[in-house]
Swiss-Prot record:
Binding site for DNA: R300, R319, R324
Protein name (record): Holliday junction branch migration complex subunit RuvB
Record: residues binding Mg(2+): T75
Organism field: Burkholderia cepacia
Subcellular location as annotated: Cytoplasm
GN (gene name): ruvB
Function comment: The RuvA-RuvB-RuvC complex processes Holliday junction (HJ) DNA during genetic recombination and DNA repair, while the RuvA-RuvB complex plays an important role in the rescue of blocked DNA replication forks via replication fork reversal (RFR). RuvA specifically binds to HJ cruciform DNA, conferring on it an open structure. The RuvB hexamer acts as an ATP-dependent pump, pulling dsDNA into and through the RuvAB complex. RuvB forms 2 homohexamers on either side of HJ DNA bound by 1 or 2 RuvA tetramers; 4 subunits per hexamer contact DNA at a time.
Region (Head domain (RuvB-H)): 264-355
Gene3D superfamilies: 1.10.8.60, P-loop containing nucleotide triphosphate hydrolases, Winged helix-like DNA-binding domain superfamily/Winged helix DNA-binding domain
UniProt lineage: Bacteria, Pseudomonadati, Pseudomonadota, Betaproteobacteria, Burkholderiales
Region annotated Large ATPase domain (RuvB-L), chain positions: 4-190
Gene Ontology cellular-component annotations: cytoplasm; Holliday junction resolvase complex
């Protein structure tokens, strides 16, 4: 898993932050209020109403669970919620909270109506999660003082607060934890027009000269993810500074992204390597995950966690009971003719999941 995480971070089209330096860069571009937040109209509209209602009643906002693929703005929304409520935000992550005392220290230092943001909340340990339940429901925690026979439980009252939890894997949350969130919102991938607006906004903040077609070219290759769009913008800006007097047009963006091996649909070398292996080494599939991993020289976890999700989501790859199968889109993308529906190759190529 460590190798998988490292590999994901090294890809320019990875949706996870590549480094602490990139996280600093992201914060500089982060919108500060809902009016500036592009996309996710349904979620944004709901939050506008819930936040305004809580402010009118002088109450903390109900606990919020944000889930969806990485890089779509969950952390940004947590910061916006705190700013719109006019309160402080304390930020941590599930893996950091190793002991119950870690969480207790955070909770007891919150002021009235503050926001506590826990990223990767699905990775909370069971011990820490148990402490969280009464805190969410009754604004109280039970902590143990002392050891052995002298140990005793002490109940501490907390200030009312809002928990904002973020996760890329909502299915890994326990039911008791999930049920304690009054507001649950799924963040979806962005379309090219929305990403183009984000690119233009980020370019303005970076004092980069970009025209609408240049922004759209970057957006179309950003895999529906603002984090990737901003990362590609930085690299295209570098290219434009050296090769095009700082002007980012569609042609300049295309040349820069071609140099980075990011093709018109956002695939990089690893994506193409996987799909071409299925097409050429296994006649379009089906092929088992272990055979595919051996064929391209990657770990099974890397394929399942890093490469496949976007390819499946975009309809270029299909999982069937017999293995991975290339779809019509894959053949078209590589300029190949798909096998006839009645051929041996085409019978599984056209089989839906679960058949």
């Amino acid at each position: 898993m460590i190798e998988t995480d490292k590999l994901a971070a090294e890809r320019i089209i990875a949706a996870t932050p590549a480094s602490s330096h990139e996280e600093v860069f992201e914060r500089a571009l982060r919108p500060r209020q809902l009016d500036d937040y592009v996309g996710q109209e349904k979620v944004r509209g709901q939050l506008e109403i819930f936040i305004e209602a809580a402010k009118r009643r002088s109450e903390p906002l109900d606990h919020v669970l944000l889930f969806g693929p990485p890089g779509l703005g969950k952390t940004t929304l947590a910061h916006i919620i705190a700013r719109e409520m006019g309160v402080n935000l304390r930020q941590t992550s599930g893996p950091v909270l190793e002991r119950a005392g870690d969480l207790a220290a955070l909770l007891t230092n919150l002021e009235a109506n503050d926001v506590l943001f826990i990223d990767e909340i699905h990775r909370l340990s069971p011990v820490v999660e148990e402490i969280l339940y009464p805190a969410l429901e009754d604004y109280q925690i039970d902590i143990m003082i002392g050891e052995g026979p002298a140990a005793r439980s002490v109940k501490l009252d907390l200030q009312p607060f809002t928990l904002v939890g973020a996760t890329t894997r909502a299915g890994m949350l326990t039911n008791p934890l999930r049920d304690r969130f009054g507001i649950v919102a799924r963040l979806e991938f962005y379309d090219a027009e929305q990403l183009s607006r984000i690119v233009r906004r980020s370019a303005a903040l970076l004092n980069a000269q970009i025209d609408p077609n240049g922004a759209l070219e970057i957006a179309k290759r950003s895999r529906g993810t603002p984090r990737i769009a901003n990362r590609l913008l930085r690299r295209v800006r570098d290219y434009a500074e050296v090769k095009a007097d700082g002007q980012i047009t569609a042609a300049v963006a295309d040349a820069a992204l071609a140099m980075l091996d990011v093709d018109p649909v956002g695939f990089d070398l690893m994506d193409r390597k996987l799909l071409e292996a299925i097409l050429h080494k296994f006649d379009g599939g089906p092929v088992g995950i272990d055979n595919l991993a051996a064929a391209i020289g990657e770990e099974r976890d890397t394929i399942e966690d890093v490469l496949e999700p976007y390819l499946i989501q975009q309809g270029f790859l299909q999982r069937t009971p017999r293995g991975r199968v290339a779809t019509l889109l894959t053949y078209r993308h590589f300029g190949l003719s798909a096998p006839a529906a009645g051929s041996a190759e085409g019978s599984m190529w056209n089989t839906p999941d679960g058949a």
